[in-house]
Each structure stands twice: as structure tokens, then as C-alpha cells.
């Protein structure tokens, strides 16, 4: 789910991707499937907002909407070897995503800047999550030899090599790049609800959360500075877990009747894709409760 300001017709649009990888535009009375792009209909990951809308084809690479022509353009694909692509995130001047599965045992984080510059950095294992946040900090969660390997760096000035830190021996189900007194990140695992918080902007030190989330599944992790609250949120099934103290203590509660499959926070509003068992619905709610009255 990505929110777009369509400056041509002056209305809000949302880019939505189905579980099959098909793309749709919805909003303002419009609901239309986007035809296959260069033959690809495997866009499992989308990111951005406003005038920067991107979609990542699992086999075809990164596509971005040209705001002048309103057409999708290929921004990155490895031309030497066939890789798979996943975990797309947007920062102020570019995109971050994972490249791997090329049969060479290599795993990479790719940074593509809006000016066309590309940076490729090696990581030790498959990437399960990427998150960008305030001040263009980026947190990457990878797995290697049974443990979480977390990379934190400034996306606008990526170092020549990335250094990981290990909060624990678990798979990082979600990483959330946020802010609490200073940039910090949260790593969460569905294994025993393990949750760790970085105690400095560069993610070199991690401490276990005092009160963990109590979720039975994970859909998404999100940071939103809602009314200055520095809110970290995890959602799964029809439950949410929220921290307002930098990720140290989490309060878990049940959402409304909908199971949320995606969630974003834009311009002081929460938007979600929810399912009631028979239909998928686009929901909006400033209080993040998502009940029947707010569909």
C-alpha cells in the first residue's frame, strides 16, 4: 500500500499490490489493474509515496514511476546474472532493496539514487527486512548461521563496506528504523516475540525490550511520529502491539473486525488494507482502530 498525490487530477491515489504480485491504482472512485510491466507481474514489494513511487519485481528489478510521463521505468536490474529482488524501502533521495538468489551464494544490499547512481554492498546472508526512517537512516535485517545480523547505515552516504551487529540468535522477522531522542531501530522476531532495541544511531549496541509484544503472527512493522509520540507499531492478524518509549515496552491489543494485510501512516492518517474474510477493503482511521465505520 503506497499513497500517491496525483498532481494532474488533484486527487489521492493508492498503489496496491495483490498477493499474486499484480499492481492496482485505487482512490477517488478509481480501481484499475496496471498491465504487466515489461512482462512482469511479480511486484510483491512496493514503496515510496507522493511523487516517488517504486515497485520491485522479484525477477525484473526496480521500476519507478516517471512523474512527467506517468510511465513505469526500469531503474535497476543486474545485466550479468539473474538474481532475485526483495524488500524495497524508500529514503529521501533513493531506494534500498535486497539482491540475492543468483546461484553464486552472494547477498547484496542495493542502493539506487534518484540521479541514477547505484551502490552495491555485500551482506553475510539473506535479508528478511529493510526499513528506512528519520534522517535517512537505514536498518537491514539479515540472517546468518542461525543469528540475526543487523546493519545500520546512513542511506545518503553509504560506507564502502557494511558492518553487522548481532542482537541474538534468531531470525529478524521485522526491523523498524525510527527515532527516540535520536535515530534508533527495533528488531523483532516471531520466535518467542524476541524484541531488541538499538541504544545508539549506528546500531552498535542492542538491549532486550523490558516488555515484549505478544503477537501470534507478523504482518508489518512501522514507525510513525504521530503527534510527537514516536510510535513503533507491529501488526499481525487482527492484533497490534505499540511502543511509545523507543521500543522498550510494548502494549498489545486487538484491532477491529478486520485482519490487516498492510498498514501505512501518511499526513497524520493511518491507511490499511483489511480483510473481513470475504473482501479486501481500503480502510482509513486517524485512531488506528479500523472498525466497520471507517472503511
Segments from the language model and where they lie:
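Entry beta-strands of beta-propeller and related beta-repeat scaffolds
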Residues: 12-13, 42-47, 52-54, 93-98, ...
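A short beta-strand motif characteristic of beta-propeller blades
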Residues: 25, 71-78, 117-122, 160-168, ...
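Enriched but not universal
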Residues: 1-24, 288, 294-295
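Periodic glycine anchor positions in long extracellular repeat architectures
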Residues: 27, 48-49, 116, 141, ...
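Residue-level signature of beta-propeller blades and closely related beta-rich strand-turn architectures
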Residues: 19, 29, 50-52, 101-103, ...
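Repeated scaffold domains used in trafficking and secretory/extracellular systems
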Residues: 3-10, 32-46, 81-92, 123-135, ...
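A detector of repeated loop/turn-to-beta-strand junctions in beta-rich toroidal repeat architectures
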Residues: 57-59, 105-106, 147, 192, ...
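Conserved Ser/Thr-centered positions that define the repeating blades of beta-propeller domains
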Residues: 25-26, 64-66, 112, 153-156, ...
Amino acid at each position: 500500500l503506497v499513497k500517491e498525490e496525483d498532481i494532474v487530477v488533484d486527487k489521492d491515489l493508492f498503489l496496491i499490490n495483490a498477493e499474486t504480485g499484480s499492481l492496482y491504482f485505487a482512490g477517488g472512485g478509481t480501481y484499475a489493474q496496471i498491465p504487466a510491466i515489461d512482462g512482469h507481474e511479480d511486484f510483491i514489494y512496493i514503496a515510496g509515496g507522493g511523487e516517488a513511487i517504486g515497485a520491485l519485481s522479484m525477477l525484473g528489478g526496480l521500476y519507478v514511476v516517471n512523474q512527467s510521463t506517468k510511465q513505469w521505468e526500469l531503474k535497476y536490474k543486474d545485466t550479468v546474472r539473474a538474481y532475485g529482488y526483495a524488500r524495497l524501502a524508500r529514503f529521501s533521495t533513493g531506494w534500498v532493496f535486497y539482491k540475492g538468489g543468483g546461484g553464486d551464494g552472494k547477498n547484496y544490499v542495493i542502493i539506487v539514487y534518484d540521479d541514477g547512481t547505484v551502490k552495491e554492498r555485500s551482506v553475510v546472508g539473506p535479508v528478511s527486512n529493510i526499513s528506512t526512517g528519520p534522517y535517512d537512516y537505514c536498518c537491514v535485517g539479515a540472517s546468518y548461521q542461525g543469528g540475526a545480523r543487523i546493519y545500520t547505515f546512513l542511506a545518503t552516504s553509504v560506507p564502502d563496506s557494511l558492518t553487522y551487529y548481532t542482537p541474538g540468535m534468531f531470525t529478524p522477522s521485522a526491523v523498524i528504523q525510527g527515532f527516540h531522542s535520536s535515530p534508533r531501530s527495533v528488531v523483532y522476531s516471531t520466535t518467542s516475540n524476541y524484541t531488541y532495541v538499538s541504544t545508539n544511531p549506528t546500531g552498535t549496541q542492542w538491549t532486550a525490550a523490558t516488555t515484549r509484544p505478544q503477537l501470534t503472527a507478523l504482518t508489518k512493522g512501522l514507525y510513525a511520529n504521530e503527534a510527537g509520540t514516536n510510535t513503533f507499531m507491529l501488526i499481525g492478524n487482527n492484533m497490534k502491539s505499540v511502543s511509545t518509549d523507543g521500543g522498550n515496552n510494548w502494549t498489545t491489543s486487538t484491532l477491529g473486525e478486520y485482519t490487516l494485510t498492510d498498514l501505512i501512516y501518511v499526513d497524520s492518517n493511518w491507511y490499511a488494507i483489511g480483510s473481513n474474510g470475504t473482501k479486501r477493503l481500503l480502510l482509513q482511521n486517524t485512531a488506528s482502530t479500523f472498525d466497520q465505520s471507517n472503511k
